[in-house]
């Protein structure tokens, strides 16, 4: 410390000079003010004759002091000198072009120190975790030391080093030395990487590990620029092997929901590792590796093993998780989409194809549609591809059984619109009809629906069984919107007929009041336009004279106002309200016309045989048997059948039940003849097929008339485009042959597959 004073003095003297110029305090920066005493003066500045020199041994002495400070930092001992003094010493040396030597000397000191650190790490006896802690301590010490060293040599770093692009900064030099002499050592690097992978492996197995240690070491590898080549490649390789084996094992051992939960958990864990200690650049390949091995390699197996069960059980959370996970991997959504479609087609086919399930088919379809809609809405995030393929799948399976679904959908609408349906409010009924219309869109045979819908609508209108005129018209509006005005024109005509009939009956009743005293029968007639309504087979029955007379009176009245028209009575559609006297008192019966004719016979006698009733009424055999069944074998047994039994035989006798009892005053006896029979179904379907033949013939003639000459394949293709119902190639061929036989068209003599229109 004895010579510290003189050193300070020389440094101070050196720093006090500025190129030999000392600026007097009296000098101003600008010219002298005008009006001042004395003349103008010149200031002459001369350069030093000799360049200022550092004191002898200054460089060596200063470096010795700096070297001592660096060694003290590296050995974690106290520094004898003030840091500001050391910084000033570096600046002094740099100002006198000693920078290259100073940089080399500093590098050598740092390199010697780093090289000396490698020896303890070459001991084989070190435990992996202990080794990692030791290397981490070494790294932390090195970083702390280089920060302090750089702060002392900052002037060197910001001048000489900055001006020489080939030289690394002092901090980068420290990283380079640590990388070259410690972490690039084969044994050290191997033990470091293996130790890190061991800790990560333990953590993946559920053990608690020192995450801060991992974070520090991986940050070290990243700073030393060996992270990607030395660690990441090996880490991803081990990750790949781990999850490949895990995926194979767990797919065998676990159910799909449990497996998907495990995949989600693994993805969350790996994402957390990236956030906590891995480099951000590892995130994409790491997550992709987990997704590929746990999901991508098992897409089909997962779907085959679990999708059907999840959908059957309506496991919404599990399906949501499946969709979210499958959306992460290439081809995942597509695979899910295809299996989803196959499930819909398979499950839907079981609903429509089995005749034993016809009773519940439409409700099952509606429930199934609600279910898949909910899955798309909640689980599949309203994905358009899933919505569109769901619609295609419904259309595919619902048409695997031609015609029947269309017929049953029409009947389902009838059950909802019929009076007595108490299960829904107006708003609920509207929603039900909207859902039914969705099913209606899927069916190809819309003409079959129309035929059965028209037949059921006729019954509702004629027997007064419609629950709501508003609901009826709402359904009509939906059909019109879906299929166009041509589809609903006849249905709308039926409503118009009913409204006109009401007006006609008002005038007829006024006419009857003016003509004579009212009779025992109050007649109401519905005038139906034959082209609008279903075709009904006329049945000639024996009406009571009073009914016949009233019919003639109405006929005369109507034709008097509408000359040129023809009336045809449809007895099968008639119904009446009869009054009857029993021992217990009076009752009223709401019955069909056929039931009316049978019951009126018992005004003339107490008992009749089946043959006698048949002769007296003229009702056809099968219709009469159903009528007598409703009167003698149903809940309201107005007649007593002898012998007892559910079936009506030829020799049966029927007696008036004078002891008939019922809690209601007006009793509706089930109108069995109004219920659809197998014959009616066949008849309705046959009429649809007949109408289709007419439409095919008309389309063929229309096309040939316009094109004159056309090949068979082109004609068939054109027909498929024009016809609005499903048709088989064989059916088209039959219609073409029929038109050729009827001379509407002819084959080309040289080319049988070519047709010519015959004018």
UniProtKB/Swiss-Prot annotation:
There is a cross-link at residue 33 (Glycyl lysine isopeptide (Lys-Gly) (interchain with G-Cter in ubiquitin)). Coiled coil: none annotated. Can self-associate. Component of multiple DCX (DDB1-CUL4-X-box) E3 ubiquitin-protein ligase complexes that seem to consist of DDB1, CUL4A or CUL4B, RBX1 and a variable substrate recognition component which seems to belong to a protein family described as DCAF (Ddb1- and Cul4-associated factor) or CDW (CUL4-DDB1-associated WD40-repeat) proteins. (Microbial infection) Interacts with murine cytomegalovirus M48. Residues 691-750 form the Cullin neddylation domain. The keyword DNA damage applies. Pathway: Protein modification; protein ubiquitination. The lineage of its organism: Eukaryota, Metazoa, Chordata, Craniata, Vertebrata. The keyword DNA repair applies. It comes from Mus musculus (Mouse). PROSITE patterns: CULLIN_1 (PS01256), CULLIN_2 (PS50069). The modification Phosphoserine is found at residue 10. Keywords: Biological rhythms, DNA damage, DNA repair, Host-virus interaction, Isopeptide bond, Phosphoprotein, Ubl conjugation, Ubl conjugation pathway. There is a cross-link at residue 705 (Glycyl lysine isopeptide (Lys-Gly) (interchain with G-Cter in NEDD8)). This is Cullin-4A. One of its GO terms (biological process) is hemopoiesis. Core component of multiple cullin-RING-based E3 ubiquitin-protein ligase complexes which mediate the ubiquitination of target proteins. As a scaffold protein may contribute to catalysis through positioning of the substrate and the ubiquitin-conjugating enzyme. The E3 ubiquitin-protein ligase activity of the complex is dependent on the neddylation of the cullin subunit and is inhibited by the association of the deneddylated cullin subunit with TIP120A/CAND1. The functional specificity of the E3 ubiquitin-protein ligase complex depends on the variable substrate recognition component. GO terms for cellular component: Cul4-RING E3 ubiquitin ligase complex; Cul4A-RING E3 ubiquitin ligase complex; cytoplasm; nucleus. Gene3D superfamilies: Cullin Repeats, Cullin, Chain C, Domain 2, Winged helix-like DNA-binding domain superfamily/Winged helix DNA-binding domain.
